[in-house]
Amino acid sequence: MKSGVAQIKPSSGHDRRENLNSYQRNSSPEDRYEEQERSPRDRDYFDYSRSDYEHSRRGHSYDSSMESRNRDREKRRERERDTDRKRSRKSPSPGRRNPETSVTQSSPAQDEPATKKKKDELDPLLTRTGGAYIPPAKLRMMQEQITDKNSLAYQRMSWEALKKSINGLINKVNISNISIIIQELLQENIVRGRGLLSRSVLQAQSASPIFTHVYAALVAIINSKFPQIGELILKRLILNFRKGYRRNDKQLCLTASKFVAHLINQNVAHEVLCLEMLTLLLERPTDDSVEVAIGFLKECGLKLTQVSPRGINAIFGRLRNILHESEIDKRVQYMIEVMFAVRKDGFKDHPIILEGLDLVEEDDQFTHMLPLEDDYNPEDVLNVFKMDPNFMENEEKYKAIKKEILDEGDTDSNTDQDAGSSEEDEEEEEEEGEEDEEGQKVTIHDKTEINLVSFRRTIYLAIQSSLDFEECAHKLLKMEFPESQTKELCNMILDCCAQQRTYEKFFGLLAGRFCMLKKEYMESFEGIFKEQYDTIHRLETNKLRNVAKMFAHLLYTDSLPWSVLECIKLSEETTTSSSRIFVKIFFQELCEYMGLPKLNARLKDETLQPFFEGLLPRDNPRNTRFAINFFTSIGLGGLTDELREHLKNTPKVIVAQKPDVEQNKSSPSSSSSASSSSESDSSDSDSDSSDSSSESSSEESDSSSISSHSSASANDVRKKGHGKTRSKEVDKLIRNQQTNDRKQKERRQEHGHQETRTERERRSEKHRDQNSRDSNWRDPITKYTSDKDVPSERNNYSRVANDRDQEMHIDLENKHGDPKKKRGERRNSFSENEKHTHRNKDSENFRRKDRSKSREMNRRHSGSRSDEDRYQNGAERRWEKSSRYSEQSRESKKNQDRRREKSPAKQK
């Protein structure tokens, strides 16, 4: 005890208080109560209360407040006892000590608790959150210490590293670095961590919906390489949307539907899923469901308009009905009206894919057809670590896939090529040094056309960044490109013009300025015109129109010479549909610029006629007619006046060329043969006239007309012969227009006579067939035709045939007729001589009438043939012929009726 006192004595008051408090805490409740009874403070307090009690007994009334204080004190003591009992149950109280142990506890070494249970040290990798932060260097050191790569510890550490890297990369992605993030993400084993990747993407999108288009582009790229990852993300999105719809969680529905909309825009999800979601949201419309549907429709409305117009029309029809019902809030009604305005503007503020995020080709994308109502497994097991017995094998497989995707297998070959190329460069430098010493120059020919591509790109950017053609020409001239690129510059100007939707005058003015600056540019455009016309069938109609209008502008402004039209040859064989369209647009544009009179005057320019021979052909009447029809069909018939005159004079030229050809080919005896032929013609005409006069005495006037006709033909032959001797060239014959016109009129009259003769012969044959059936009916048309310069042999043949037909008809009547009728006919019939006399009289009367009518018809025919030059089509001539023939047929019918009335059978 003394030692204990001696040790406590030098301590301060603060130490004593701490020891006292610790002693009181460690003592049991009974010891504390005994100590309170022994303490002087408690005794004084007790005496004070007792004196108060005696004082109140002496003369004062009972104080109720004191009783309440005593009750509170007792309750406090009971409460302390209860708490002490509870503590004593949990742990044995250290207050009950033996006197022997009290001495030992007073020492500082014995004040500390005897034994403490040490907590088991937990592995930080096995905790739920991954434990404390482990620096990367320490983590790599821990992984290196593990020799077995298939062990649980190593797989756990690699899983934690995979999770952290995926989360970090997903949180860093944006439009500018998405390609870099994709490459870094593919370096990790995302097949093993596909659950982690899906969870990270969905969490990042729900936390920041404004970057949904970026996450959708990221998912689209991963889906093109690993479709199972895209399918897993889409399944979880559908489940999240259904969960939010059931819970009436508008925010969850908004984020999920927005992500689905952008996946539809990226062709990861099918548009049927979008229509199903919209139908579900608008089936029982509320304020929140309509708001979610409108937000969803804004994001993917343009895509739906392109791929499913009927579906989006049905959705907007449903929105219109909801708006008319007016059962929703005013704010939502305004949202619907705004949605209709957005649709009217063509979703211009909501494009399908933003610029810079269209990173996957349509052919490489894999679209998932996942309906809304199916049951899906979210595969939450993939979010947590699970030991893989084939860990290293799966890692090697993913490395092979990663090499295929990122082309990492070519790195070694590239290094070898770099080493080899460095050696080759050294050798080339040595060779160049030797050649330079010898004084020779080395030229390198680039066959890859990289310089050409960059040159065309520079020209295109200069053209697109210029406000007017003068600024553009100034920029292009400052570039100082070589002369070999002159034609390429002209080609680039033409290509830029052809690519426009409509023709812009900017390019015509620019090309015209270059043509006026240098002759080389003009020659380049001349060559380009010929090349374009030869390959015009390769261009589309829109490009063809722009090219034609640009060249028309160059010709109108005289920037190009009109000699370039030499390559155009208008004929049915040398043109195609594309070339005809080109020529049509080209000349219509020229006519619009210059006007038809100026254009016609330019085409009639004598100095340019050699270049227009193919455009306005005169070599062949068929080609001439084709050119006339072509220009007339495109509304430029005024350009073909000379061609029409040439086409009219073509028969005259051909007739005039025949004597020259005969004169060049024939021998000197050709003149004698020509004279003999003329004599034979005259003898034939004389024989024809003698035959015609031998028919009857009434045909003398006809024979005289035939003889006069033969004399006229002889005169024509003499005139032709005189023309041969007088002129040998075609130009001299064309100048004698009067003689040629007279000959042409005579030929037309002869041709008209021949046509009328052939027509009358054809009708006479038809009437003979009809008259052969009736013996008493006479054939007046044969008489009519016999008077019109028909040869005597044909008339004799027709008479013999007529007599034979009549005799056969009489024989048939004699065989099959009644004997009484035969006797009456014998009595009343005339003799054959009397019949012939009657026929001759009738024929003379009708011949006189027919002669007068034929002369009138010849006058009409000659007048009509003289006016025939005014016709431009053959249809009107045919119509006039048919009208003439109809008049003749009517007159012949009248004559037939008259003859029937005057016939002997009628008189009897």
UniProtKB/Swiss-Prot annotation:
Residues 163-346 form the MIF4G domain. Belongs to the CWC22 family. The modification Phosphoserine is found at S39, S61, S107, S786, S829. Component of the pre-catalytic spliceosome B and the catalytic spliceosome C complexes. Component of the minor spliceosome, which splices U12-type introns. Interacts with EIF4A3 and PRPF19 in an RNA-independent manner. Direct interaction with EIF4A3 is mediated by the MIF4G domain. Full interaction with EIF4A3 occurs only when EIF4A3 is not part of the EJC and prevents EIF4A3 binding to RNA. GO terms for molecular function: RNA binding. This is Pre-mRNA-splicing factor CWC22 homolog. Residues 100-109 have a biased composition (Polar residues). GO terms for biological process: mRNA splicing, via spliceosome. InterPro entries: ARM-type_fold, CWC22_splicing_factor, Initiation_fac_eIF4g_MI, MIF4G-like_typ-3. SMART domains: MA3 (SM00544), MIF4G (SM00543). Residues 407-438 have a biased composition (Acidic residues). Residues 666-680, 703-714 have a biased composition (Low complexity). Residues 1-130, 404-443, 654-908 are annotated as: Disordered.
